[in-house]
């Protein structure tokens, strides 16, 4: 027993103080002592206690929203009142200077390829105390850009289309950066972020203390980053494509046998990809990104329906926009092969019906696209099933027109016209000549009947 105790004491390498624990429990010395006592008895759980401490620090650092107070009557002009309110909001908002402040980290990953807002390799960081997601220059060690975690509205993890090697794009969309909702006056706007993670194990991912993580069996870099983000996003979750929502009729071009979740489309002359997700429709990956959240969509309709392609017209309204203030986005040159899947997605969420827009705005789909209430979904599906979609009508009319053209089509005779059939004008002239001949024959018969036997003495050409 004595030898075991001495041996255990000799192998201890726990530092006297741990920064994450010191920061988290600075105001609770008795609790901090209990944590250190537990670490002394079970040193193998140091990483666990550090994670708990960092999470506690992040909770303490998050600003608490005070309960809404009734607005007081103001004798001043309404414009002046709005200006004062906006100034207060801007003062309470976190600034870019806060994003770049030096603070302890919870997680960082080196050599991450960013595509937005800058195209370069940077270190991805998540801070412990202040709750920021940010990117640091690996040469200068300066923070290039970032966003407070509580200002993030959507995080998407999407497979990169048309790549031989499997990769994932993480798209972080802060408040007012979705391409639809403009910022209020004086509000700080943080840029959207896009970075790429290759499929496979994480090679340079670390905890805040510098311990390498992500090397567990079966854990990939994508699943690690997604897990870390979900642990730090209290109000939303990372959204991935789901074949129950939409899957393309065409498989991945460069990875045979793998399902594709994107649809190629154009916005103006800019080519991009559409993803139909559980929380909305995303168009990327080039600036500017656009995310059509369900609560912003008024309706979706089809335009420019052709044999091989069609367009989607998405009407949206911003959160602070008036009821009649809508803007439209046209996504063009979508392959007809994906019509059925897109149409099913639109009907499932009732996006073809503008009368359901207010219900979508009121609901806001709790936990970033958790299940909608079944009654609303079933009603939307039932209403959609009774209606023939605009695209189906257009397709039916196009087919009817083609059938009529085929019935009227005359391939012509193999005469001396260099192999071409007769035109419709020639057909009309031939019909007129035939009618004139019939009329003349009828007149001759009538004259002969009137003259009777005397007609024999009349020359044939005078009848």
Curated annotation (Swiss-Prot):
It is found in: Nucleus; Chromosome. GO terms for molecular function: DNA binding; histone binding; nucleosome binding. Residues 85-95 have a biased composition (Polar residues). Residues 399-417, 424-463 have a biased composition (Acidic residues). The keyword DNA-binding applies. Belongs to the RTT106 family. Histones H3 and H4 chaperone involved in the nucleosome formation and heterochromatin silencing. Required for the deposition of H3K56ac-carrying H3-H4 complex onto newly-replicated DNA. Plays a role in the transcriptional regulation of the cell-cycle dependent histone genes by creating a repressive structure at the core histone gene promoter. Gene3D superfamilies: 2.30.29.120, Pleckstrin-homology domain (PH domain)/Phosphotyrosine-binding domain (PTB) (2.30.29.30). The lineage of its organism: Eukaryota, Fungi, Dikarya, Ascomycota, Pezizomycotina. Keywords: Chaperone, Chromosome, DNA-binding, Nucleus, Transcription, Transcription regulation. One of its GO terms (cellular component) is chromosome. Residues 60-97, 368-463 are annotated as: Disordered. This is Histone chaperone rtt106. Interacts with histones H3 and H4.
